[in-house]
């Protein structure tokens, strides 16, 4: 991401909602609702204030900075091979995130340089490029200053030698003066004497000035001294303030370290000023070595950037997937750069061992237990006599066969069809429990029936239709006369369909008004609706075909235009004339040759035509009879408007079979889904469902926090009470590692947790109401789909690949099904995972339903037929819709 000057910049993040309009910036894909915000951000991107985060180029627009970053990342995507082994050492066995790893590795590479690298640096305000020779570990600033002084002395000595060679100065005088100076410089003078000498010199000067009568200069000197004293005092005060600030900063850092607060990322280049690390660098142009501090090194060639470091980490290493994962370098690179001897840190040693064990198991290698057993067998065999060599060979062969089997074991879960399901006792596969399919209709149409019932009950407020149980709906469809459930469901569905634009505008609006439908004319409107549907579908198909023809014609024209060349029209015309001429000639030749044959064949052709006409008349008559018979006996076999329209013209609705009625309702439901009312209701449910999910997350977090706080308080109490109890500590040590004592929860916390659990149950019920899409439990090896709904708790439904339906309705059948399913397959593992948490609830509901059925049968067996006829009211007949028209 480009930098705003030198600071990082964040893009605008807006949640895009479907159906709303936004102003979008193309190169950032930012969405803005207000035009003003869009213009302000676009003008900001046009300003030349952006810098490339990779190359460091400045004074760019945002788009130019993005392009420079893209080009730079394409050119250099990995660290050089010279630095790669050092990077691998740094990455191996680290327990940090990818972002932390990139920051730390980038900082590590800025702080360290290695022999052989080409580097640019500054020395005495002059830029040089050279090659690093070595790191000087025991090197100080004093050594650097002495080296600089030696260089200066060497330069000054060269200048003095040039002056001594001149004829004006004799050699003797120079030697004496130099020797005397060296002798004086060798004498040690104390600091106090130096100060006294300075003061004495100043006093002599002052006396001379007094003698000269310069009184004005004395006053000026005193003022200057006073000013200097004041400046010194101010400097001392500033130093004291700086020290106090540094102390405060150190205290703040200690507080931050204690509280473990998140710190802002600091540029590692700023840390180089405090580091004292020196490198010996050889410069080819100068032909000599330079000793340079790390802060004076400007950059290495090729340069290193953060995106490059991130890409190298991704390509070179991978983080283990288990909890508390660490970074692991690819084994090929470890062998290539001889990094096999890297020490594993103590904090990660157990995790590394477990990870290696998992790898061996996945690859099919021997487990630790089997290895130990094989070692014990070998030791026992060696202790035996030589006469038992045959038995040893047999044991070795058996061990080899076991190891081969373990290596051949596949890594589960695998494809369900590939799982070997042969039972060791019987040698056959376990059979699936037989499911019952004694529905009131065909098993292929039962899925449509369930879909219609769920739709009518779920969208009751939109359709204005009171809910009803599945059993009543079954009986209402089977009934030979009108029932309120059947009539109201048809009316409410058609009313929502007539709100569609194809029926609410134009000529259909007059005949298909929502208010015109009643319980008296609903059958007539149903027939008229399907007649209109047939016409509408035919018109739509014609429009589609016309559009396809137009597209084909456009494509042909475009191809012809593309194939045309300059001067090709004349050639085409000539070719056409030639072709026409040839054809004419051929036609003439054929007429001359075949003129004699035509007269002979005329009589034969006339006879054949008469025979064919007679046969066609007979076939037409038979076809018409067959069509009439088919139309009379035609059956609705699918939710198709044409077949439904034909059947409703010739048959009464209540003479139709149950399957035909289900297909009619299924077609009406599919049409109502496209209405605007249903769409708005779905959007509201999605929003409300998201709100409930957020509330649920908050309650779960509260519950976790309560348990953690209670556990922490209990642990503190235990530590205080058990300080002097050595016996309890010894007992805890003797316990196995896996046994963990669950500390009891306090009664106050228990009450709060119960309240939260009740809230969660209420929220789960709300989510079920707002969820429109039904989800299956899963699939088995043969792709059968298993369904369970809380609205229909008495059965587990099974949907086959062909569309047929079955069900299980007892605990024994469910247990047999769980035994039949295999955990080693992908699909069946998921199915078992979804069944197990719901097992207790499903079993309780199945048993409850079976008890109710038994009680009902026993109760009805005691009653006489006369009492049954008098006092039994059928609920599907007495049902009434609470919503008004």
From Swiss-Prot:
The keyword Cell membrane does not apply. Residues 210-264, 578-603 have a biased composition (Basic and acidic residues). Pfam families: DDT, WAC_Acf1_DNA_bd, WHIM1, WSD. GO terms for cellular component: chromatin; nucleus. Residues 443-503 form the DDT domain. Residues 141-184, 201-264, 367-431, 562-632, 707-744 are annotated as: Disordered. Residues 20-125 form the WAC domain. The keyword Coiled coil applies. Residues 217-260, 530-565, 593-628, 674-782 form a coiled coil. Residues 367-379, 567-577, 604-631, 715-729 have a biased composition (Acidic residues). PROSITE patterns: DDT (PS50827), WAC (PS51136). It is found in: Nucleus. Residues 154-180, 380-396 have a biased composition (Low complexity). Keywords: Coiled coil, Nucleus. This is DDT domain-containing protein DDB_G0282237.
């Amino acid at each position: 991401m480009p930098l705003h000057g030198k600071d990082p910049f964040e893009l605008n993040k807006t949640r895009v909602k479907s159906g709303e309009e936004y102003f979008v910036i193309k190169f950032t894909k930012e969405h803005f609702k207000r035009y003003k915000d869009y213009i302000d951000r676009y003008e900001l991107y046009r300003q030349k204030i952006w810098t490339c985060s990779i190359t460091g180029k400045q004074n760019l627009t945002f788009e130019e900075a993005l392009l420079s970053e893209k080009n730079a990342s394409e050119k250099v995507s990995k660290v050089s091979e010279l630095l790669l082994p050092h990077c691998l050492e740094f990455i191996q066995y680290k327990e940090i995130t990818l972002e932390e790893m990139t920051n730390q590795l980038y900082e590590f590479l800025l702080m360290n340089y290695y022999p052989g690298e080409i580097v640019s640096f500054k020395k005495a305000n002059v830029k040089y490029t050279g090659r690093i020779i070595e790191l000087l570990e025991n090197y100080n600033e004093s050594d650097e200053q002495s080296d600089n002084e030696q260089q200066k002395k060497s330069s000054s000595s060269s200048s003095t030698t040039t002056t001594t060679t001149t004829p004006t100065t004799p050699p003797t005088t120079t030697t004496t003066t130099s020797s005397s100076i060296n002798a004086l410089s060798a004498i040690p003078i104390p600091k106090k004497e130096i100060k006294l000498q300075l003061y004495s010199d100043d006093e002599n000067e002052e006396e001379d000035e007094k003698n000269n009568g310069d009184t004005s200069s004395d006053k000026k000197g005193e003022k200057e001294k006073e000013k200097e004293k004041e400046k010194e005092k101010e400097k001392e005060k500033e130093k004291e303030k700086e020290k106090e600030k540094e102390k405060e900063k150190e205290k703040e850092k200690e507080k931050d370290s204690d509280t473990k607060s998140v710190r802002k990322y600091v540029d590692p280049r700023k840390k180089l000023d405090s580091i004292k690390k020196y490198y010996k660098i050889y410069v080819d142009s100068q032909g000599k070595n330079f000793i340079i501090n790390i802060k004076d090194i400007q950059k290495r060639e090729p340069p290193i950037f953060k995106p490059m470091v991130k890409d190298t980490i991704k390509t070179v290493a991978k983080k283990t997937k288990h909890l508390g994962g660490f970074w692991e370098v690819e084994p090929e690179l470890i062998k290539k750069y001889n990094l096999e001897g890297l020490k594993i840190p103590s904090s990660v040693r157990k995790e590394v061992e477990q990870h290696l064990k998992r790898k061996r198991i996945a690859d099919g290698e021997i487990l630790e237990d089997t290895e130990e057993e094989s070692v014990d067998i070998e030791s026992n065999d060696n202790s035996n006599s030589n006469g038992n060599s045959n038995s040893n060979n047999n044991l070795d062969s058996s061990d080899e066969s076991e190891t081969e089997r373990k290596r051949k074991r596949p890594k589960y879960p695998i494809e369900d069809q590939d799982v070997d399901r042969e039972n060791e006792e019987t040698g056959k596969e376990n059979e699936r429990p037989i499911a019952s399919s004694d529905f009131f209709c065909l098993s292929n149409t039962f899925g449509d029936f369930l879909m219609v019932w769920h739709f009518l009950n779920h969208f009751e407020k939109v359709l204005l239709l009171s809910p009803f149980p599945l059993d009543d709906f079954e009986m209402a469809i089977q009934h030979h006369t009108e029932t309120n459930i059947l009539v109201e469901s048809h009316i409410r569905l058609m009313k929502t369909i007539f709100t569609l634009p194809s029926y609410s505008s134009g000529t259909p609006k007059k005949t298909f008004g929502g208010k015109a439908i009643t319980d008296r004319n609903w059958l007539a409107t149903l027939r008229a609706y399907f007649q209109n549907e047939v016409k509408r579908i035919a018109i739509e198909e014609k429009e589609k075909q016309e559009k396809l023809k137009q597209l084909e014609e456009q494509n042909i024209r475009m191809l012809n235009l593309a194939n045309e060349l300059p001067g090709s029209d004349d050639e085409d015309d000539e070719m056409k004339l030639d072709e026409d001429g040839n054809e004419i000639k051929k036609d003439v030749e054929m007429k001359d040759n075949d003129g004699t044959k035509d007269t002979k064949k005329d009589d034969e052709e006339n006879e054949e035509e008469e025979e064919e006409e007679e046969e066609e008349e007979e076939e037409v008559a038979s076809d018409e009879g067959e069509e009439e018979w088919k139309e009379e006996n035609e059956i609705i076999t699918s939710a198709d408007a044409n077949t439904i329209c034909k059947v409703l013209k010739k048959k009464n609705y209540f003479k139709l079979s149950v399957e035909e009625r289900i297909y009619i309702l299924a077609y009406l439901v599919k049409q109502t889904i496209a209405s605007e009312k249903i769409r708005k209701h779905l959007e509201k449910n999605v929003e409300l469902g998201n709100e409930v999910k957020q509330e649920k997350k908050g309650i779960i977090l509260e519950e976790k926090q309560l348990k953690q706080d209670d556990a922490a308080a209990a642990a503190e109490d235990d530590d205080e009470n058990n300080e002097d109890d050595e016996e309890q500590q010894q007992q805890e040590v003797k316990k196995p590692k896996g046994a963990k004592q669950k500390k009891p929860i306090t009664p106050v916390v228990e009450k709060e947790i119960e309240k939260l659990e009740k809230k969660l149950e209420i929220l789960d019920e709300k989510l079920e109401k707002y969820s429109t899409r039904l989800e299956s439990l899963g699939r088995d090896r043969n792709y059968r789909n298993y369904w369970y709904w809380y609205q229909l708790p008495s059965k587990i439904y099974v949907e086959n690949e062909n569309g047929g339906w079955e069900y299980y309705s007892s605990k024994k059948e469910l247990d047999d099904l769980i035994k039949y399913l295999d955990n080693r397959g992908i699909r069946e593992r998921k199915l078992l995972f979804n069944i197990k948490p719901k097992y207790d609830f499903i079993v309780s509901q199945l048993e409850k339903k079976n008890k109710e059925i038994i009680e009902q049968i026993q109760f009805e067996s005691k009653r006489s037929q006369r009492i049954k006829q008098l006092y039994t009211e059928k609920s599907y007949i007495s049902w009434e819709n609470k919503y008004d028209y």
